[in-house]
Amino acid sequence: MKQSANATAKRSRTVVVLAIAVVLILLGSILAQTFNTSFYNVKVSRISFETDSGTLSGLLYLPKNVDASTPHPAIVTTHGYLNSAEMQDETAIEMSRRGYVVLALDMYDHGHSRGNAENTGGFFNFWPTSLWDAAQYMYQQDYVAKDAQGNGQIAVSGHSMGGFSSEMALYLDETNYASTGYRII
């Protein structure tokens, strides 16, 4: 009888500890979401869009006061090799808190993005156009600011391999400028 009382008490303690752990996990998740959205001043959503080279996806950080009537400058940022958009969370949160529209991008064949092999090239050729394609997408959004001449107010940023993609995006933007007369980036 004494052994069964000890087993019951032990089981009760286990249930209490488990319940406390679940409550702490839920509170931690709510707190993390609160910080991730800058105390709900930034809407964070996963978006995806089609390009000639495949499907790009990323996390869009949209400050609360941004819409077509009040467009804001944008920043497209991307990760290094073997990473995904979530790697840029801290940077994206800080930039969006300061009023920038931020797209933290998954490059082709990373995270939720998929490239078409015939359009992105062969092995390891996913990075040259990822950021450029995303900048073109952001330029088309009515909540992204443009100057009086139609130039986009979009910055690009990347970590490691994403830095190479940023350089390539700037090169492609200059090539585009030569034929269109306006800059996207």
Question: Which sequence ranges carry the predicted segments?
Answer:
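N-terminal cap/lid segment of alpha/beta-hydrolase-fold proteins
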Residues: I30-T70
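Short beta-strand element of the alpha/beta-hydrolase
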Residues: S69-G80
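The serine-hydrolase catalytic nucleophile loop
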Residues: L82-I93, M107
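Alpha/beta-hydrolase active-site loop
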Residues: M87, G121-A145
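Alpha/beta-hydrolase fold nucleophile elbow
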Residues: V144-S160
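Short glycine-enriched nucleophile-adjacent loop
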Residues: G163-N176
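A conserved short beta-strand
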Residues: N176-I185
